[in-house]
């Protein structure tokens, strides 16, 4: 009878494990533990055993009964938990869309600048952000004791190493390794000791350089005019003003008609109707000489612009610091 009891337990546990609802479990309980169940009948038949075997068989039967009841209780709880989890899902509720990131406005503008000049034959190059004094200043005709070298304008790492103050150092680096003709633009981060509504200690620039035979200021004006019309609007008015940069001669500032007031005068343009957008000029012969270029055979022009400045005008943003605050309410607009 003991072997028969083991068989009863094995069959009952299999049926409990395969049950998928409480009704099935109730049937299993009646089948094995009910008044006419297999375990109950086994206990009733103990009188047929020899007297010396009855205690051991009775103890085994009661243990099987307890084991089966415990298995039934666990299965009932699991089925109830599974049912509650399913019932807790309201399939009629609208789904939650996955939140997707977008390109930062500075990245958008930088890529757009590279795209426009890329269509005009300019290659994109990059340079180190930690730069030597020579490439950041000397190679660009910025001599010792020039105001741009002052501590209030430049982050010095050591006496001869700085965080680059512009992306212009890329130009002499490329010219030393590349014979003309060449057309390059150099986007990247730059650093200056400055922080206010329109300036941050770290910002982004794009420098451009074109060198070839017979390159003129007229070529510079034509390329920059085309760039501005493609970046903003074909009807955008612009003007070139005389200026000074150590690495270009002659030099110019380029202004566009104020995008906010359309030239009528407002707070953004200081009531002049114009907004400065970039600086440019013909490459100074001293820069060519340091790079090993023949100043009698080649001429060229260079230009530089602040990406934040372009983005502020493009998107009508009044504070450059918004680009660096990581406010998703602001960034989600782009």
From Swiss-Prot:
Its EC number(s): 6.1.1.20
UniProt cross-references to InterPro entries, sorted A to Z: aa-tRNA-synth_II (IPR006195), aa-tRNA-synth_II/BPL/LPL (IPR045864), Phe-tRNA-synth_IIc_asu (IPR004529), Phe-tRNA_ligase_II_N (IPR004188), Phe_tRNA_ligase_alpha1_bac (IPR022911), Phenylalanyl-tRNA_Synthase (IPR002319), tRNA-bd_arm (IPR010978)
Positions of Mg(2+) binding: 249
UniProt entry keywords in alphabetical sequence: Aminoacyl-tRNA synthetase, ATP-binding, Cytoplasm, Ligase, Magnesium, Metal-binding, Nucleotide-binding, Protein biosynthesis
CDD domains (UniProt xref): PheRS_alpha_core
Cofactor(s) the protein needs: Mg(2+)
One GO MF term attached to the UniProt entry: phenylalanine-tRNA ligase activity
Swiss-Prot/TrEMBL catalytic activity: tRNA(Phe) + L-phenylalanine + ATP = L-phenylalanyl-tRNA(Phe) + AMP + diphosphate + H(+)
Pfam families xref list: Phe_tRNA-synt_N, tRNA-synt_2d
PANTHER family the UniProt entry points to: PHENYLALANINE--TRNA LIGASE, MITOCHONDRIAL, PHENYLALANYL-TRNA SYNTHETASE
Protein known as: Phenylalanine--tRNA ligase alpha subunit
